[in-house]
Amino acid sequence: MSKKFAEYSQFDLSKVNKDVLKKWDENQVFAKSMTEREGCPSFVFFEGPPSANGMPGIHHVMARSIKDIFCRYKTMKGYQVKRKAGWDTHGLPVELGVEKSLGITKEDIGKTISVAEYNAHCRQDVMKFTKEWEDLTHKMGYWVDMKHPYITYDNRYIETLWWLLKQLYKKGLLYKGYTIQPYSPAAGTGLSSHELNQPGCYRDVKDTTVVAQFKMKNPKPEMAQWGTPYFLAWTTTPWTLPSNTALCVGPKIDYVAVQSYNAYTGQPITVVLAKALLNAHFNPKAAELKLEDYKAGDKLVPFKVIAEYKGPDLVGMEYEQLIPWVNPGEGAFRVILGDYVTTEDGTGIVHIAPTFGADDAQVAKAAGIPPLQLVNKKGELRPMVDLTGKFYTLDELDEDFIKQRVNIDLYKEYAGRFVKNAYDPNLSDQDESLDVSICMMMKVNNQAFKIEKHVHNYPHCWRTDKPVLYYPLDSWFIRSTACKERMIELNKTINWKPESTGTGRFGKWLENLNDWNLSRSRYWGTPLPIWRTEDNSDEKCIESVEELYNEIEKSVAAGYMQSNPYKDKGFVPGEYNEENYNKIDLHRPYVDDIILVSKDGKPMKREADLIDVWFDSGAMPYAQIHYPFENKELLDSHQVYPADFIAEGVDQTRGWFFTLHAIATMVFDSVSYKAVISNGLVLDKNGNKMSKRLGNAVDPFSTIEQYGSDPLRWYMITNSSPWDNLKFDVDGIEEVRRKFFGTLYNTYSFFALYANVDGFEYKEADLPMNERPEIDRWILSVLNTLVKEVDTCYNEYEPTKAGRLISDFVNDNLSNWYVRLNRKRFWGGGFTQDKLSAYQTLYTCLETVAKLMAPIAPFYADRLYSDLIGVTGRDNVVSVHLAKFPEYNEKMVDKELEAQMQMAQDVTSMVLALRRKVNIKVRQPLQCIMIPVVDEVQKAHIEAVKALIMSEVNVKEIKFVDGAAGVLVKKVKCDFKKLGPKFGKQMKAVAAAVAEMSQEAIAELEKNGKYTFDLGGAEAVIESADVEIFSEDIPGWLVANEGKLTVALEVTVTDELRREGIARELVNRIQNIRKSSGFEITDKIKLTLSKNPQTDDAVNEYNSYICNQVLGTSLTLADEVKDGTELNFDDFSLFVNVVKE
């Protein structure tokens, strides 16, 4: 019994999704895609670890589709592609989520809840949405090993991190320093520069700013002649002014002394500021006013410049403490030099608070300026603001320090105030801020020259969304700057998609690299494996659990630990199985309880910090295989490293992409990945960021359920390049489902219907190309060209181009051209060689398309492929994803034939567009197309497909005109956007010359693609791309131009043409009735048509033609037709009765 190609009653891609998933699971297709490639070359892919403490979104479908495409493609190209899933389980996102769910803050940890209990909650919470992630991954068809993922909280994973840190330590790249760092009071930890540079961290905020007046102690004589002398310094953070200890001027900046008045108090003042910023603070109109004539409240405040200075002239001048709450000691309150001072804004004088700015701390230290620090109850030096973001309260400070250094009457009003409202749980943005309070106090005290709101760019914490502070922290750093040049050098070898991200965003980041702040003052994360003595005289960096085990043994012997907790739990060093490592926990608080012993017998405690969670993910190439404790040979022999390809969102450019690159460079002097796609954001259809709060987020689960995964994936990939932002619109998914998948499904259905009627199973040998009709040779040539181009696109990480090429082929060449032109070959009776060629050709196209589209649309590609080979048996694999990618056959490519057919398609498209312009249907014959040919090659191409064009556009003849002169009048119009920059002042003359171009000159421009003018002895060359060539319509004709091709269509409809058009229209209407009546394609019919003076002549003349086309045995005209179907034409109607014989 012959096999039949599957035929479907409806097209449901959601059902296809489920059916194919079931098939994959039952046949273990994903596993086979790797096992069947055992021994083949490896294509190495790294999966960036998401965090499972949040639900996956529609943007994750985009990111995972991109990864999946190239892994599937490379598998089909014969590579073994192993891909291991991973979970990012540590860090702020997890901790903040747990704090919120438990209703606690960081300060409660260790008090109301133990660290062990807290971390247990974190361990559980971080995997909360694992099932949802696995479900989405499964449903969208992303093949990645979810059964054996790497998990960053795993002890073996952490051990590899420790080993990597030890390598950095041994190279001198790990150090401890007390520096100003970005700090998040809301999260309670310092941040690295790459965290601070995540997208959206820098935001425009409107803050209260002040130009402060710093009263001089020892003014120059000319400065003391009018009122009180002051230095002016501007700040966007008035809360830092109580910590001011210096003013900074630029070494090459010009300054002026200006006599004027304080606009708030009306008091006379002499102020010093940068000359370049004079007009920013004084109205130039007031320069003409006399100082003596000023009255308090006048809108224009007079001013007079009395002296000029260079920055160094002001150095060493002293001033009074602006806000004398705390005495910082000797050496403060003087003017110093700083190269970073500019005149872009402010006053050209920078207020220095060494405890709250990296540049401030640096210049202050160089000039011997002390920072303003408090002493707490423990005797520790601290900045005026505590780690929660508030001024220290008096009861938190050392009593002796308060007596000696603190002005209690002034300080107590502000003690305990948060420096930002965002840090105070009891305040909103609408409440008065500390900045405003300080500015109002300064205004009253004649210390404020100008107070105003100012919009500036300010960093925010990437996880809490609250402002950061620049804060002095005792932190561990990776000296990444020491390897900066090598990172830049290696980056140039990476294939970035797009290239601009590698040279721009990422490259510029590397050029301005800072040392990596590794420390995190948190609880759930990888502990820093460094133990130190209390006096910091000795330290140990531990690289493995075995080393820690042995060091504990020494500590036990020294009496610092009673027993070895790892030995007590039965842990065996050197046994790397999961069961052994599950006996221990390398997290806090357990690792904190371990005391080691130094070389000279002192106890050593672990440094309390955790490490940056981005180090966890950046170490995944090594930690996922427990390198170097296991699988050392695999990595060292480059079987699993570096990655051939990775992909993540653009937000990872300074995140995962950087940490991968940094660790690989510093530890292995290697790249971590050879190619990377940095995909853009998925926005809503209006270009806004999606969020649940705004109600514009798209649920991926319901979208897949409604449309299936393939249309979603195809839409996302083909709508725009992966690295461009996607304006997501569900209407686009439906359009893809209908236009591409619907067209492909209909093409297959057409094939299956007739192949089943004829019993075609592709058992015959392939017909030689020279025995196939020209149309078959053409489509197979185009198909092979497609194979080559799509293969190149996939190989060059250009999935959008690949998808669009496939879509264009299916829609334009296969369905709309090949199948439509060849329907009759499939309808005809008998199984001729011509029909066999048609079947083999169409089958080959469908099977090849299934393979080409498989990486992007894995479900329907597999269904289509299985439906085809299930009958023919031409491949012995269970899935298209186990098949080989199509190979380009150059012998089947005929570029001349492709050019001819492209000409037919182009002419047809242009003529059909002209028909639509005057609303003349294609079934209405027209008399003539006139084509002025540019050259003999163009004419030959059209001649070769002349009959086809005439048939497609329904015209009686094609006339060629040698040259357009005398028949069609062409004109040229300049594209000034292109030509303007090219010709500049000559543009007017060029435009005049273009307007006067002769028909012969225009013909030359069309033929050669360029034309040279003589403009008074100077040559001017224009190209065809720089202008628009158009033709004027002539009476009774419509004209269209496209590149070198011009067509004119005669649109006059004669009576003879009208009769033929009616006959063709009747055929179409009757065929529709056959279809709606459910007739079989072989059923014969009898026709009765009502008489009508508009149609009778046409019916009589074309009676035989109509019958032949609709399988009619007779066509009779009657005065009245009972039980007929009404046929409505533009200006009349008639009835037809169709009866099956």
From Swiss-Prot:
EC number(s) reported in the record: 6.1.1.5
A GO molecular-function annotation: tRNA binding
Keywords linked to the UniProt accession: Aminoacyl-tRNA synthetase, ATP-binding, Cytoplasm, Ligase, Metal-binding, Nucleotide-binding, Protein biosynthesis, Zinc
Record's subunit section: Monomer.
UniProt lineage: Bacteria, Pseudomonadati, Bacteroidota, Bacteroidia, Bacteroidales
Protein name: Isoleucine--tRNA ligase
Organism expressing this protein natively: Bacteroides fragilis (strain YCH46)
Record motif 'KMSKS' region, residues: 689-693
InterPro entries, per database record: aa-tRNA-synth_Ia, Anticodon_Ile_ABEc, Ile-tRNA-ligase, Ile-tRNA-ligase_type2, M/V/L/I-tRNA-synth_anticd-bd, Rossmann-like_a/b/a_fold, tRNAsynth_Ia_anticodon-bd, Val/Leu/Ile-tRNA-synth_edit
SUPFAM superfamilies xref list: Anticodon-binding domain of a subclass of class I aminoacyl-tRNA synthetases (SSF47323), Nucleotidylyl transferase (SSF52374), ValRS/IleRS/LeuRS editing domain (SSF50677)
Family classification: Belongs to the class-I aminoacyl-tRNA synthetase family. IleS type 2 subfamily.
Cofactors (names): Zn(2+)
Location(s) in or outside the cell: Cytoplasm
